[in-house]
From Swiss-Prot:
Protein's recorded name: D-alanine--D-alanine ligase
Cofactor comment text: Binds 2 magnesium or manganese ions per subunit.
Family designation: Belongs to the D-alanine--D-alanine ligase family.
Residues involved in Mg(2+) 2 binding: 296, 298
UniProt: ATP binding residues: 154-209
Keyword line: ATP-binding, Cell shape, Cell wall biogenesis/degradation, Cytoplasm, Ligase, Magnesium, Manganese, Metal-binding, Nucleotide-binding, Peptidoglycan synthesis
Stored PROSITE patterns: ATP_GRASP (PS50975), DALA_DALA_LIGASE_1 (PS00843), DALA_DALA_LIGASE_2 (PS00844)
Organism: Shewanella halifaxensis (strain HAW-EB4)
UniProt record, GO biological process: cell wall organization; peptidoglycan biosynthetic process; regulation of cell shape
Cofactor: Mg(2+); Mn(2+)
Amino acid sequence: MTQKNLLLLCGGGGDEHSISLLSANFFETQLATLPHFNVLRVELNAKGQYRTQAGELCELTNSKQIRFNDQSKAPWDVDYVIPCIHGYPGETGDIQSYFELINLPYFGCDSEASSNCFNKVTAKMWFSALGIRNTPYIFLNEFNQQAIEETERALEKWGSIFIKAASQGSSVGCYRVDNKEQLANSLEEAFKYSPYVVVEKTINARELEVAAYEVDGEIIATKPGEIICASNTFYSFDEKYAENSQAQTVIEADVDEVIAKQIQEYAIKAFKGMKLRHLSRIDFFLTDENEILLNEINTFPGQTQISMFPKMLQNHGHNFAQYLSGNIMAQLK
């Protein structure tokens, strides 16, 4: 088999840059077991600069080449890209739009699906359109007195709320508010991360996650795993990634089989309905009354040592490297 040149693009320069690098480490490890890929890892920084692991400045050109600033070095033809970038500009769909413009095949969801899922406003509209219940919410497009008053009414109605920047991942710009004293400051902070803000009712529920992905053209939804947070906390950025995190992860949650099957069916419905591709992690709430609510969809889930997606995929009986290779080669035929 002829080797294919695979660009592992990571970083992105956003709030999740460091996590993207950790995920890229996992992809590198898996790709190293696949001799038919010749891998070049390139980091994209906040200034929009591309740099190899050897520290060489370079750029991805419209002719689908990595061109080095050192003119004495020959350009490197790119056959395929893995955009291992959490948050902007990866999960937002921006970098995928560029790949589509230059007709460069890549791993993961396309630009439109990525954008629709990443923005919490459009995502929740899609969930409702697909007939999948989700948390009650309002959304705001400006930080002003009217927004504060609307949020105060939501707090009075629901008792406790989450204020979330609409265009952020990994709980960046996300604040739990239980009283009016916290409200205005939390709202102002959320608007620093995004021009749109979602205000959601706080749901006291179990947090369940499903790995939804494709193998040989078939959509797979694993049994739900579970995130167990310390009492009265939520799964914040620090809880997800800090070494001293108190959160626990369970690869296969202890839930009724009927409930688990329903969650898997919702995950597949969301995957199909939102035109996802290759991989996703779909997160749900399960209330004490066994009500299932779709929380969010992550179109490029983390692949760190503590990340659920690769563990759930493996627990479901799939080898990650072979799953990855199968999806890549299907596009390169």
